[in-house]
Amino acid sequence: MKASALVLVAVYCMGISEAFAGGSQASNDKHGPAGIVIGERLVAARAKLVKQGWKPTPMHATDGYVYSGVEKELAAHKFFELDTCSFDSSRCILYYAKKGTCLRIDTRGEQFNAMTVTRWTRECPETTQ
């Protein structure tokens, strides 16, 4: 009886863990689309994606969004697939698309040349109404 209760608790904990981790990247394999990897510099990852046919999704071309902080640096380097960056932890979200499939890339870094990939997921940008 005690063993079955422990198994039940273990299965429950595994389920909770999977539920919270499930939205990250397709089980966050070591290599993502186009062979990108966690910790890879954004510039290198983007080059791989574009070479494999992923197209940057322009995020703020017509909505009057005002870039600030590291967002300005990304925009200056023509990374218009940038959705947003946080102010407190320098995490940024960028979007790409290929043959109807969306790709979200999350990065971290306060300087353009030091920005690295932290995760990816098959997620489309939210549409504004």
Q: Which role does the model predict for each range below?
A:
Residues M1-L6:
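Bacterial N-terminal signal peptides that target proteins for export
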Residues V7-G15:
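Bacterial N-terminal signal peptides
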Residues I16, D88, Y95, I105, ...:
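General secretory precursor processing signal
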Residues S17-A21:
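Boundary at the C-terminal end of the N-terminal hydrophobic targeting segment
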Residues G22-K72:
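N-terminal secretory signal peptides
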Residues G53-G100:
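A cross-family detector of function-defining hotspots
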Residues T101-Q111:
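Broad, structure-driven detector of short, well-ordered beta-strand segments within folded domains
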Residues E110-Q129:
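A short, surface-exposed interaction/processing loop segment used at functional sites
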